[in-house]
Structure formats: structure tokens, C-alpha cells
Design a protein with these regions (language model features):
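N-terminal secretory signal peptides that target proteins for export/translocation
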Residues: 1-14
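Basic side chains
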Residues: 15-16, 411
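Residues marking helix boundaries in flexible regions
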Residues: 10-13, 19, 277
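Feature marking well-ordered beta-strand scaffolds used for ligand recognition
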Residues: 30-493
């Protein structure tokens, strides 16, 4: 960081402190800007290619799908805000509950907004349609070959399947209703097996797993319910940490990696996929343990939002070892939930787990953005990790990982040596007039700041990086440059 940049930060912090003091003396709330509208993005070895404001909606999960000769982004949204429960859809002129944005990103420099599908009523986490996964009908064993299917959540009450063969004119296929919560599901396109993060009514937790056969999306078949012993209906005693999400390696890898906990009480669970699908179904303690190979309880201070399997990796420093020179690695990402590093939450970060001995997985490395580099705890909103890309396309897989860090943007990590991960790039988007404030209490008064809140990230096979913002700023399409681009093996741009 340059001397000029340090001086700018000191001036900003001084002005911010004066503003807060004046607000408290006057007894009213204050909105301060850590970033200013018109300021350029902050970046290293990453650059902005394209942008879409997503109609000013708080965004969660982007899924990028190669659809014929087009590339389409399906982006899930949180519900609206108290101030704007129904943002306007410029395509229809109507106020609409936030749901799913469908954007043509074939030309990433000029994304085209095609359609908004409204979601469930409710603000913030209570509404919207946060999650998206997409499969081609021709890949599903019993799918309509002419169809393309979007699996999305509908608030916390349902999962929906839509035919998006014409992405500008989606058609609802079916809705799986009667749930008390939903979240970050996984769908295998080559088998149709879906691991749905749900809230079955009789379970003791908000979120658990429903395993479905969606090989024919028009005729879903429920296979079983799954969770940790003590969460199932009729159980007693302490309730274990609720589910957050999972990632399957499919029939070839025969593993499902479950992550329990968000910012506390994290658990990594390694499960035999075949035993989970074909084993005994009744959710009693023995049957819930039956498919489990290994389980790692993290510190109570950290969660397990994303459990991304990197598979077998050659460890550079072990290259001359005659035994175990390759290791089976899982990357775990926590999620920060607290604004401005306040009480009640430890620093959330990234952990690298050696799961070569699956019954005894162990943490071997970690990564965190240095807070003092830019005084992120004072910028406003959340500072800490949230989510990583989940694409296993060769362009980045086992080479670069991208992790969102809320007000610290998205960070590019060199993971070729997972025992020694290192940051090789970052991009912190600029705020706009649409960027929403985030508040904390100071002496009983609301003190609010406007800052970027990079929420989730995904990549595509072409090597583009898609970052969406929780604070309503929109979609940023990025590419890596310099040394980060060389690591990916992409041609110079």
C-alpha cells in the first residue's frame, strides 16, 4: 500500500470519527461513506470486464450456464429491504418481489438483462429466491432433451424447477412445498440426484438435507432425509449445528462433503454417496451414521459455510516423498454475519483440510485478509469470508480459488500448494447510488455506513469471475491479470 493511500485512509477515518461524534451528540442516526461514489474500484491482478446493476436487488448465488452458443447467468436474490421491499423491474415497469435475475453474459463486457422471476414475499433472508442450480435436460437421465432446467429456492418454503430453454421466457415445471427453510443445494446433472437444503417440518433444526431423484424434473422422487444424529424427529438432548450446504463429487468420486454451521460450531462431514442414497432410509441415529466416513469438528468460533473438495493434489514440498506425496484436500470457507467486527463473532476465514485419511481429517493451513491493510473493520458492513467459487472446470480448479470477503471484495488465492495458500489478486468493487447502508449501534444510536458487500462468487469455463453484491450494487464480471492469469494458464490479455 502506498504512502498516499495510507494518508487517504487516515483522513477518511478522521472524518468518519468526527461525523459519528456529531451524530451521537445530536442524538440521531448517521450514514457515513467509507467508499465514495465515483471512486474507482480497488484491484490487484484482477480487472472489471462488465457490470449489471441487477435492478438494485440484493444478490446471493450466481450460476453460470453454457446454454447452446450462449452463456447465461442465473442469479438468486435475497428478499427486499424495509425501505424497498419491491424494487422496480424496468423491463415491466412493475414493483416486484426479488427472486431470480436471468442475464445473458455471452459478451461479458456487455451483459444483457433478460428476465426477472419474482420470489417469495419477505424482506432480507425471509423472502426472495436465493439459490440457483442449472442442468440441461439432455444430460439428465430422464429429462426432456429440449429443456434446460433451473432449480431454485422459493424463499424458505419451497424448491422450484423451471424450464429455461428460452431464458427470457421461463416456464414453471413443479414446486416442492411445505418446508420451513431452504438454502444452498447441490444438483448432479449426470444423475439427477439432488441434495436439497431444506427444513422438513418435524426436524429439530431449520436446515437439514432432503435427497431427491430429479432425473425427471417433472416427476421428483424423494429418496430420504438426512442430518446429524440429534436433529431428527423424536430425538432429545442438545441439538447439533444445523446444515449450511454440501458439494457432491458424483458417482465417480462417491463422496458428499457437508458443511454444518455458518460462523460458529462448524462441522465438516465426509459421506459415502452410494450408502447415503441406497442405504437404510429411516432417520434414526444408526442410519444417519451409516454413510458417514469421517467428521471434523471445528472450533466453536468458526463455521463451515462452503466445503469445496479439491481432490487429490500433488504437494510441491512432498514431491520426493515415497509415500503420501499427494493429499486429498478440502477447502472450508466460514461466513461472517456481524457488521464492523463487533462482539459475538470471531474472525471468519478460509481453512485447508487434509482429508487423505478420511476418518481423521485435519486442518493444515488457513488464509485471511489482513484487516490492517485497509482498516476493513471500520469501512462498514461485514468484513470476513463468505463463499468460494464451486466450479470444477479445469481453467481454475486446483490452481486458483476465489473467495468473497464482503467489504474486502473478492480475493484470488493461489492454491497450488494448499499447505501454503497465498493471495495473488483482489477486486473491491466501487459503490454506486444503489449500494445500501449497513448499521451498528453506538451508545444506543444507529451509525450506518455505505460499503460494498461482495457476497457470492462463481467462475465459468472461459475464465471469467462473477461476483454479486449483498448491498444491492449488482453483478461484476472480472478477469484475472498478470501473475494470477499466468497461474491459470490463460493467454495474456
Amino acid at each position: 500500500m502506498t504512502r498516499l493511500r495510507r494518508a487517504e485512509i487516515k483522513k477518511i477515518n478522521f472524518r468518519r470519527s468526527i461525523t459519528v461524534v456529531m451524530a451521537l451528540l445530536l442524538g440521531g442516526p448517521v450514514v457515513a461513506a467509507s467508499q465514495k461514489i465515483g471512486d474507482p474500484p480497488e484491484a490487484s491482478n484482477m480487472r472489471l470486464v462488465g457490470f449489471n446493476d441487477l435492478q438494485g436487488r440484493s444478490a446471493y448465488q450466481p450460476t453460470i450456464h453454457h446454454q447452446g452458443n450462449r452463456w447465461i447467468a442465473y442469479i438468486g436474490h435475497h428478499g427486499g429491504t424495509d425501505a424497498v421491499p419491491k424494487p422496480i423491474n424496468p423491463l415491466t415497469g412493475q414493483l416486484e418481489l426479488s427472486g431470480t435475475s436471468i442475464v445473458d453474459v455471452t459478451d461479458p463486457a456487455h451483459p444483457v438483462y433478460l428476465r426477472h422471476l419474482p420470489g417469495q414475499e419477505g424482506n432480507y433472508e425471509a423472502g426472495g429466491a436465493q439459490m440457483t442450480r442449472v442442468c440441461d435436460g439432455k444430460d439428465l437421465p430422464k429429462g426432456d432433451p429440449s429443456a434446460v432446467y433451473l432449480l431454485r429456492t422459493f424463499g424458505g418454503s419451497a424448491h422450484e424447477l423451471w424450464n429455461v430453454a428460452d431464458p427470457a421466457n421461463p416456464k414453471l415445471t413443479i414446486r416442492l412445498e411445505g418446508l420451513k427453510d431452504t438454502h444452498k443445494s447441490w444438483w448432479e446433472c449426470n444423475t439427477g440426484i439432488a441434495f436439497l437444503v431444506s427444513g422438513a417440518p418435524n426436524w429439530r433444526v431449520r436446515r437439514m438435507t432432503e435427497v431427491y431423484d430429479l432425473s425427471d424434473p417433472a416427476k421428483p422422487v424423494k429418496i430420504r432425509e438426512f442430518g446429524l444424529p440429534g436433529q431428527q424427529p423424536g430425538s432429545t438432548g442438545n441439538v447439533p449445528t444445523e446444515l449450511h450446504g454440501m458439494i457432491s463429487t458424483g458417482p465417480a468420486g462417491n463422496r458428499v462433503y457437508f458443511g454444518y454451521g455458518t460462523n460458529k460450531g462448524g462441522i465438516l462431514q465426509i459421506v459415502d454417496r452410494d450408502k447415503l442414497i441406497n442405504g437404510p432410509k429411516e432417520p434414526n441415529p444408526d442410519n444417519l451414521r451409516f454413510p458417514v466416513i469421517g467428521q471434523m469438528e471445528m472450533s466453536p468460533l468458526n463455521g463451515a459455510h462452503t466445503t469445496f473438495p479439491l481432490g487429490k493434489m500433488a504437494i510441491p514440498n512432498f514431491s520426493k516423498d515415497k509415500f503420501a506425496s499427494q493429499r486429498d484436500i478440502v477447502m472450508i470457507v466460514d461466513e461472517s454475519l456481524v457488521n464492523e467486527c463487533q462482539e459475538g463473532e470471531a474472525r471468519q476465514m478460509v481453512w485447508f483440510v487434509d482429508a487423505t485419511v478420511e476418518t481423521k481429517p485435519m486442518v493444515v493451513a488457513s488464509y485471511s485478509v489482513p484487516e490492517t491493510s485497509e482498516n476493513f473493520c471500520e469501512r462498514g458492513g461485514r468484513f470476513g469470508s463468505h463463499s468460494s467459487n464451486e466450479s470444477m472446470a479445469p481453467v481454475f480448479y486446483k490452481k486458483l480459488a476465489f473467495v468473497t470477503w464482503f467489504n474486502a471484495g473478492v480475493r484470488a488465492l493461489d492454491i497450488r500448494d494448499p499447505y501454503h495458500p497465498k493471495e495473488v489478486g483482489y477486486f473491491i468493487p466501487a459503490i454506486t447510488a444503489a449500494t445500501d447502508k449497513r448499521c451498528i449501534k453506538v451508545n444506543g444510536q444507529d451509525v450506518c455506513k455505505v460499503a460494498i458487500q461482495s457476497n457470492n462468487v462463481e467462475t465459468d469455463e472461459r475464465g471469467y469471475v462473477y461476483v454479486v453484491d449483498r448491498a444491492n450494487t449488482g453483478l461484476h464480471i472480472l478477469e484475472v491479470t498478470g501473475p494470477a492469469r499466468a497461474i491459470a494458464g490463460l493467454p495474456e490479455n
